Amino acid sequence: MAKEITKIIKLQINAGAANPSPPVGPALGQAGVNIMAFCKEFNAATQKQAGDLLPTVITVYKDKSFSFITKQPPGSVLLKKAAGVASGSGEPNKKKVATLSKAKLMEVVNTKLPDLNTKDPERAARILAGQARQMGIEVEGM
């Protein structure tokens, strides 16, 4: 028989840097999970992606055990990294902060594709190009 799920927690945690301080500690403490056990498991599983912000879905079971799934970094983080900018534009329709080539966009698409709601790379490129436009990053050829 499958374990009974009591809570699902969604957090964004830096890879390899989970610690008991907020937001991880309070969220897991309320669910009754051993915080240090989660931190050790998470850090071990994500040490190769150190520094990336990872959306994480933590499933807490009735016996206070847990499992977690990490996803790819948010599209905005990947786009900023590909464009080489620290942040998006405050006025994206007036002030552009960077230009991104279609080849660079396709690299981001290949990274992010498993987490998007499409399996078609061309449609995924359109999704991420729209997100880039909203951040003030111009995409060549789109």
Curated annotation (Swiss-Prot):
GO terms for molecular function: large ribosomal subunit rRNA binding; structural constituent of ribosome. GO terms for cellular component: cytosolic large ribosomal subunit. One or more lysine residues are methylated. Pfam families: Ribosomal_L11, Ribosomal_L11_N. Keywords: Methylation, Ribonucleoprotein, Ribosomal protein, RNA-binding, rRNA-binding. InterPro entries: Ribosomal_uL11, Ribosomal_uL11_bac-typ, Ribosomal_uL11_C, Ribosomal_uL11_C_sf, Ribosomal_uL11_N, Ribosomal_uL11_N_sf. One of its GO terms (biological process) is translation. NCBIfam families: L11_bact. Forms part of the ribosomal stalk which helps the ribosome interact with GTP-bound translation factors. Part of the ribosomal stalk of the 50S ribosomal subunit. Interacts with L10 and the large rRNA to form the base of the stalk. L10 forms an elongated spine to which L12 dimers bind in a sequential fashion forming a multimeric L10(L12)X complex. Belongs to the universal ribosomal protein uL11 family. This is Large ribosomal subunit protein uL11. It comes from Akkermansia muciniphila (strain ATCC BAA-835 / DSM 22959 / JCM 33894 / BCRC 81048 / CCUG 64013 / CIP 107961 / Muc). The gene is rplK.
